[in-house]
Amino acid sequence: EQLPEDWRRFFLSPELTVQSVSGDNNVSGATLKKQAAVIQLINAWRTQGHLRAKLDPLGLNPPADVPSLQPGFWGLSEEDLLQEFSVTFGAHTTQMPLKQLLNLLEQAWAGSQAYELAHLENREEINWLLSRIESSNAPQADVQTCIARFEKLMAAETLERYLHTRYVGQKRFSLEGGESAIPALDTLTKRLRAQGVEEMVIGMAHRGRLNVLVNLLNKDPAQLFAEFEGKQTIGSGSGDVKYHMGYSSNLETPAGSLHVALAYNPSHLEIVNPVVLGQVRARQERRGEDGQAKVVGVLIHGDSALGGLGVNQTTFNLSQTQGYGTGGTLHLVINNQIGFTTSRLQDMRSSRYCTDIAKMVAAPIIHVNGDDVDAVCQVMELACEWRDTFRRDIIIDICCFRKHSGCSPWYARPLW
């Protein structure tokens, strides 16, 4: 009664008055409650499904027991497994039995791949990722693609085995246990070039560098062997050790030539990362408005060094700024589950994952079992598509192992 006349007419208008509901609606309160429980179950899988993923190729860290991923946690019974519910899965809303939904959730969120999206803030980005993660129409690799991946995998393994037997005791920082990174990087170069990228700059530490030099950048193996044998020409090169060396080459892909540069690396882990992104930014600015579409930065991290060194926090912090942003960096973690001599999680860090630092910039985080080469390459393709669409960072955590520890871990590890 105290409102002005025009506001009273507004609230009393027919459009806002309560309408009676037809009595032939047979949906019961119990049914609505179960439907709400199914929605909660789906959300639980999307936020906590990564805890159930099969990520460790050694099986030393089995998937966690997560009560909220079980229907019973939300009040659903075995009798409900055959009942159909309305669900939004991927990009579609449909009716399906609860049992079928559980199988789809398990496949999408707890296989060889695991996704962390709960820290993302942008609804468009979340929906984009959900439509791809939960898609049942994901393209499968054809025979020729699988053969190419196998050849890259064998090339990586063969090189490491040869160096191990030919140059016994020499430092080489083997990639063994994480060889799937090589077919993944090969997939990366082909996908980026198909998207129109013409230059890629890589920053990485020493582990796996020799393999990347030979099996990605096509460095002549004879030149690498000469470095092992001390046969370099006096006065040529920088005189630095072989696992610090940079290189550049033009890689031929089905979509054309891609120039790839691997930055030189000092022994101080991760310190090269801002240097690489500075190079990327300079190359982009030289190209003008479409620079971010033509030049991409790729950073390859170690698991303990990623969160352990402050330079990475600073690099992430500047990644979206006007003066230093590069339109998204592709981060790849060679996670061999051992930081120098420390393999127990409680001795390494205070967070569950080594990639948790990336949550500060709301970057999607993908964990993948390094022994599933097809899964590793599949998420690499997804990462390229993400960067091309949103111009933001994304991080892939390849969970693998270190085949040769250099000495007995019982001597090298801290006492406990």
Predicted regions and their residues:
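Extended, charge-enriched "interface" segments that sit outside catalytic cores
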Residues: 3, 10-181, 197
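Short alpha-helical segments and helix-capping/turn motifs at coil-helix boundaries
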Residues: 37-40, 88-89, 102-103, 113, ...
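Conserved phosphate/anionic-ligand binding catalytic regions in large, soluble enzymes, centered on
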Residues: 40-57, 187-216, 301-321, 391, ...
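Electropositive phosphate-/nucleotide-binding environments in soluble metabolic enzymes
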Residues: 95, 99, 179-182, 266-273, ...
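Active-site pocket-lining segments that scaffold enzyme catalytic pockets across diverse folds
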Residues: 158, 162-222
